[in-house]
């Protein structure tokens, strides 16, 4: 292969998009990621006598270190002393050992090819710090020995996935909702607006609703058998007998999985500001919990997601200075230069798994059209397929890494060896 050309069609670059909720990875040039598994991983620390539990599907960390259980199947098996942890905090890598375990697992189980053969394009949070970027670059070159590397901001990749190089990316994921202005493929740092009202917040609201309605949350791992019961009558189920002593963090994770299913099946955003009378007229949705308890949900379906758009009616948020989704967008545009605002309003791109709640985009479109200055043309871009919206930054990375014109952008191993880890600041905006 000729000296300096990496990537290209024949080498197959890998694209990693590691979010707070799931990890997405696969080959550049394909239309969707090969793998999509939870970022949360199970961790069992060795006992004092050095014995661990059965080693079947665990990935052993360093000698004497913890054992990691990664991927849906391994994570959801109840095990004694297994904590559910996440390597990320605020979208940035916090725990490097478990982060490395995720990469090891992906290479071993899914890529099934030598790390040293594939250039890697990785997505990163727009607010990622210099120290973390350099550490990541060092890890990829030194530990995985990859031939070339590139780091790109998630918002820029989302814009590319939608065929734009300028636009305002509204990304609502698990941990936060952010508006990120992108101009000519660069993130405008001063215009980033973040709000903690996102998927995890909705999960929390659902939890409170279940407590109020006295609905017991029983994750499937505890259930040995259940009987069909009438709507609204108490559940009739048998508990599994030999359950190990699970940790609270893992049990919580399993409960959240149940709630997330409920979120996707039941919730809907109201077309206009939430109104008791209108909500009462809404058709109800029937939902059955894993333990067999089932009932209809009416007004609650609209009330819970309302907090995303109108945080003032959420009880328990003290002082409440948080911004609703449409405010996040308008505030962000307002912080950018006046000349580029038309370009931002002209392509507001919606991305992230949390935006898949029914009618989310309709409500956003309606609120933004009321707030957009009359001189601006508003255009909301939202893919209607779940795949494209959940994986938008991965798809953008897949497009970018397979472009012929991108091939001179890679940080090659040679450049890394000559310039050290500082070259990531110079080559990856």
From Swiss-Prot:
Quaternary structure and partners = Component of numerous complexes with chromatin remodeling and histone acetyltransferase activity. Component of the NuA4 histone acetyltransferase complex which contains the catalytic subunit KAT5/TIP60 and the subunits EP400, TRRAP/PAF400, BRD8/SMAP, EPC1, DMAP1/DNMAP1, RUVBL1/TIP49, RUVBL2, ING3, actin, ACTL6A/BAF53A, MORF4L1/MRG15, MORF4L2/MRGX, MRGBP, YEATS4/GAS41, VPS72/YL1 and MEAF6. The NuA4 complex interacts with MYC and the adenovirus E1A protein.
Described purpose of this protein according to its UniProt entry: Involved in transcriptional activation and repression of select genes by chromatin remodeling (alteration of DNA-nucleosome topology). Component of SWI/SNF chromatin remodeling complexes that carry out key enzymatic activities, changing chromatin structure by altering DNA-histone contacts within a nucleosome in an ATP-dependent manner. Required for maximal ATPase activity of SMARCA4/BRG1/BAF190A and for association of the SMARCA4/BRG1/BAF190A containing remodeling complex BAF with chromatin/nuclear matrix.
Q: Which PANTHER family match?
A: ACTIN (PTHR11937)
Any single GO molecular-function term of the entry would be: transcription coactivator activity
Residues that bear N-acetylserine = 2
Q: Which disease is it linked to?
A: ACTL6A mutations have been found in patients with intellectual disability of variable severity, developmental delay, dysmorphic features and digit abnormalities. Additional features may include genitourinary and cardiac defects. The disease phenotype resembles Coffin-Siris syndrome and brachymorphism-onychodysplasia-dysphalangism syndrome.
* Database matches in InterPro entries: Actin (IPR004000), Actin_CS (IPR004001), ATPase_NBD (IPR043129)
Concerning its family, UniProt says: Belongs to the actin family.
The lineage's top-level taxon is: Eukaryota
- Glycyl lysine isopeptide (Lys-Gly) (interchain with G-Cter in SUMO2) cross-link located where? 62
Q: Where in the cell is it found?
A: Nucleus
List the protein's name: Actin-like protein 6A
Where is it found, in Gene Ontology cellular component terms? brahma complex; chromatin; GBAF complex; Ino80 complex; kinetochore; npBAF complex; NuA4 histone acetyltransferase complex; nuclear matrix
Its primary localisation, in coarse terms, equals nucleus
Mutation effect (residue 377 to W): Found in a patient with developmental delay, speech and learning difficulties, dysmorphic features and abnormal digits; likely pathogenic
| GO process annotations (BP) | blastocyst formation; chromatin remodeling; DNA recombination; DNA repair; negative regulation of cell differentiation; nervous system development; neural retina development; positive regulation of cell differentiation
């Amino acid at each position: 292969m000729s000296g300096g050309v990496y990537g290209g069609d024949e080498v197959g670059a890998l694209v990693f998009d590691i979010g707070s909720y799931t990890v997405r990875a696969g080959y550049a040039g394909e239309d969707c990621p090969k793998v999509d598994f939870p970022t949360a991983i199970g961790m069992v620390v060795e006992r004092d006598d050095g014995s661990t539990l059965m080693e079947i599907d665990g990935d052993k960390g360093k000698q004497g270190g913890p054992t990691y259980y990664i991927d849906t199947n391994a994570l959801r098996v109840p095990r004694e002393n297994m904590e559910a942890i996440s390597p990320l905090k605020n979208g940035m890598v916090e725990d490097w050992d478990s982060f490395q375990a995720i990469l090891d697992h992906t290479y071993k189980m899914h890529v099934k090819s030598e790390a040293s053969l594939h250039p890697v394009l990785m997505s990163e949070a727009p607010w990622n710090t210099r120290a973390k970027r350099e550490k990541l670059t060092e890890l990829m070159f030194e530990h995985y020995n990859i031939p070339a590397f590139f780091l790109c901001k998630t918002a820029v990749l989302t814009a590319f996935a939608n065929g734009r190089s300028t636009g305002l990316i509204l990304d609502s994921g698990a941990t936060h909702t952010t508006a990120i202005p992108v101009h000519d493929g660069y993130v405008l740092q001063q215009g980033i607006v973040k709000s903690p009202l996102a998927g995890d917040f909705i999960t929390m609201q659902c939890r409170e609703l279940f407590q109020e309605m006295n609905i017991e949350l029983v994750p499937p791992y505890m259930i040995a058998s259940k009987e069909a019961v009438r709507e609204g009558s108490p559940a009739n189920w048998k508990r599994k007998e030999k359950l190990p002593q699970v940790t609270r963090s893992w049990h919580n994770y399993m409960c959240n999985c149940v709630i997330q299913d409920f979120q996707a099946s039941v919730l809907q955003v109201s077309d206009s500001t939430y109104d008791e009378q209108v909500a009462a007229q809404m058709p109800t949705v029937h939902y059955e919990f894993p333990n067999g308890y089932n009932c209809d949900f009416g007004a609650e379906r609209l009330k819970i997601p309302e907090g995303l758009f109108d945080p003032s009616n959420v009880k328990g948020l003290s002082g409440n200075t948080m911004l609703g989704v449409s405010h996040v967008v308008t505030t962000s545009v307002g912080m950018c230069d006046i000349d580029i605002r038309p370009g931002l309003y002209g392509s507001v791109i919606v991305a992230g798994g949390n935006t898949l709640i029914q009618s989310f985009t309709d409500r956003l479109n309606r609120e933004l059209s009321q707030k957009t200055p009359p001189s601006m043309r508003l255009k909301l871009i939202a893919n209607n397929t779940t795949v494209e919206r959940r994986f938008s930054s991965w798809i953008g990375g897949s497009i970018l890494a397979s472009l012929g014109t991108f091939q001179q952008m890679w940080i090659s191993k040679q450049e890394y060896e000559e310039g050290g880890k500082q070259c990531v600041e110079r080559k990856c905006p």
